[in-house]
Regions:
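Periplasmic/cell-envelope proteins involved in peptidoglycan metabolism and beta-lactam response
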Residues: 1-300, 322, 342-345, 350, ...
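Beta-lactam-recognizing serine transpeptidase/beta-lactamase-like catalytic domain environment
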Residues: 2-8, 80, 226-236, 276-328, ...
Length: 631
């Protein structure tokens, strides 16, 4: 039986083919559209990102921070060096969701939410594209291991070996050398981005800040081929960095330690100078702090403890402490009186225990209420007689007195390389009119003559004023840097020397200061007992709170922090000075009883050998004989 013949439905087949063609065409168009959209997104929307990423996938220039210059004391003892350390760095452009990566870091290293906040703050600071940002320093071996195990979860994160500033002497030189710290937003805006590329710390205070350009060095560069994740494939070219310059300071660590020991646990300042050169031999401000805390970022808790301490360990008393100079200024006032011709060395003033201006009934008291009788210049300095200097200040007048004391550095910055120094205050008629809108009164001139009133000075200024007496008016600006890479620092703004009409006036004041230490009635004679050299000195007391006329100072009724400050300045050997020392003991009350022994101990540490004998280079043929005779 034959099969039936099927007739093909061409219309149906055509519809089927057309449907398939249309579907295929739509699919192709859709795919092409998706590809075009994706291409547009990559090439247009994300052009800048992928262009940079592509470039960095081929050649990446990464900075090589220069090793920072080292800092030594005058004998070659290291004060500031660099030690290797491992830090955790993160490149935001290679980390994708970098905030999520921070969360992983905190989890992996078991850190606190406070650490997370600090990390984010560091990541948001201004920086160059594709520059790694250190977020955690001083990694332990365990932390490094944890990062390595979880590296796949931490894109853009790497452990980096680097040199970190270190202060092996701890708190000894915190107020002179200063410290380094992280570059903040304000500093970042003012720094040359090329010179500080890859650098995250900068000198904040002291020598570290003043000589930042010399210590920093010059950044090097490395051209490397990397993949998109930042992994270095090969080094194409390298330009080595130029290390920073080494600095040798004039400070002596043994003298520094001796000064700290002499001051004990008391709040105060000690500064020692070489009057012939201006070199700072010791510089102590107590209490102090460990500068290593600041290098990689101090914790909020640690900083709060330092900042809020009632003893103010962060405060540099040598450079910024402002105190009335008290009677330590009297040698300079004496020079002013002699040079102005208002007194001679033999001029005598009668002291009944007080001084009164003509036509005034106010009594300006001498510290010795019973009076010293007739006193000349020598006796006035030896006894620190206030009445004599009231009279001398009155004869000079405020205009001449202010001008002369300004020549000694009072009221201006005196150092060559101490960034934080305060100028202090040397009051004048014009100053009071401008700041207080008041006229100058005669009584204010009197108390200025004994270092009280508006006058404010730093321990460094008092040391320099005393150095001018020791050096017979020759100015040598105090400085900390002895050499910078072997070169001595240059004073581009030298101070004019003090030229007297009669140079022998220096010797007259010098002799009076020697009598303070060695005279039978000298105010600080006890501090010179057993000295193998002649000392010229002057005690002082700086009032913290005023005492009404007729009242007597009663320490039992005064709070400890309201008691007078103790001051003393001196130089030795008196006939050929090798060291000048200025001491301030906060609330120490007695310059001769508290501050003078500190000066003596510092001088002994510098002038005597290990056996307690005067070093040969400091010996004077008649110094021991003269000392014994006065005692």
């Amino acid at each position: 039986m034959s099969q039936p013949i099927r007739i093909k439905d061409h219309e149906k087949d055509a519809r089927l083919v057309r449907g398939r063609v249309v579907f295929g065409a739509i699919a192709v168009v859709t795919l092409i559209g998706v590809l075009i959209a994706r291409l547009y997104f990559l090439q247009v929307i994300q052009y800048e990102y992928h262009s940079t990423l592509s470039e960095n996938n081929r050649v990446h220039v990464q900075p090589i921070p220069p090793p920072r210059g080292l800092i030594y004391d005058r004998n070659g003892v290291v004060i500031a060096d660099n030690r290797p350390s491992f830090s955790l760095s993160m490149t935001r452009e290679r980390s994708g969701d970098w905030q999520q990566v921070l969360d992983v870091i905190v989890q992996v290293l078991e850190l606190t939410p406070e650490d997370r906040v600090i990390f984010e703050k560091r990541m948001r600071q201004g920086r160059r594209p594709f520059e790694p940002v250190p977020i955690l320093f001083e990694l332990s071996e365990e932390q490094i291991a944890r990062i390595a195990v979880n590296q796949f979860r931490l894109p853009g994160v790497e452990v980096v070996a680097q040199l970190v500033r270190h202060y092996p002497q701890g708190a000894h030189f915190a107020h002179s050398v200063g410290y380094m710290g992280r570059i903040n937003e304000k500093e970042l805006k003012s720094l040359d981005p090329v010179s500080y590329s890859g650098t995250h710390q900068i000198g904040k205070t002291g020598i570290e800040r003043f000589y930042e350009p010399e210590l920093h060095g010059q950044v090097g560069y490395e051209e490397v081929e990397t993949n998109a994740r930042g992994r270095v494939l090969r080094v194409l070219k390298r330009t080595d960095p130029i290390p920073g310059k080494d600095i040798v300071l004039s400070l002596d660590i043994k003298l520094q330690e001796a000064a700290e020991a002499a001051l004990g646990g008391r709040r105060g300042a000690v500064v020692a100078l070489d009057p012939k050169t201006g070199e700072v031999l010791a510089m102590v401000s107590q209490p102090s702090f460990d500068p290593n805390l600041f290098v990689t970022g101090i914790s909020f808790k640690a900083y709060s403890e330092l900042r809020d301490s009632i003893d103010r360990p962060l405060f540099n008393r040598v450079l910024r402490g402002l105190y009335p100079p008290g009677s330590t200024i009297k040698p300079a006032v004496a020079i002013a009186g002699l040079d102005a011709g208002v007194v001679t060395a033999s001029t005598r003033v009668f002291d009944p225990g007080y001084y009164m201006l003509p036509n005034y009934d106010h009594k300006y008291r001498n510290w010795n209420r019973t009076g010293d009788g007739y006193v000349d210049l020598d006796t006035a300095i030896m006894r620190s007689n206030d009445t004599y200097f009231y009279d001398l200040a009155h004869k000079l007048g405020i205009d001449r007195l202010s001008a002369y004391l300004g020549k000694f550095g009072i009221g201006q910055k005196v150092s060559l390389d101490m960034f934080e120094e305060s100028p202090g205050l040397m009051p004048s008629r014009e100053w009071k009119r401008a700041t207080r809108r008041q006229a100058w009164f005669p009584g204010e001139t009197l108390i200025l003559g004994i270092g009280q009133g508006y006058m404010q000075s730093t321990p460094l200024q008092l040391a320099q004023a005393t150095a001018l007496v020791a050096n017979k008016g020759i100015w040598n600006r105090p400085h900390l840097a002895k050499t910078i890479e072997g070169e001595k620092p240059v004073d581009h703004n030298p101070m004019p020397d003090i030229i007297l009409r009669d140079p022998s006036d220096w010797n007259k004041v010098n002799h009076g200061m020697q009598q303070v230490m060695h005279g039978a009635r000298g105010t600080a004679r006890k501090a010179s007992i057993g000295a193998q050299y002649r000392i010229a000195g002057k005690s002082g007391t700086a009032q913290v709170v005023a005492i009404k006329q007729g009242e007597k100072y009663d320490r039992s009724k005064v709070q400890e922090r309201h008691r007078d400050h103790a001051l003393f300045v001196g130089f030795a050997p008196a006939d050929d000075p090798k060291i000048v020392v200025s001491v301030m003991v906060e609330n120490g009350e007695s310059g001769s009883g508290v501050a003078a022994p500190v000066v003596r101990q510092v001088m002994d540490a510098w002038l005597l050998d290990q056996d307690g004998r005067l070093k040969a280079e400091y010996a004077s043929p008649n110094s021991a004989e003269a000392t014994a005779r006065d005692e």
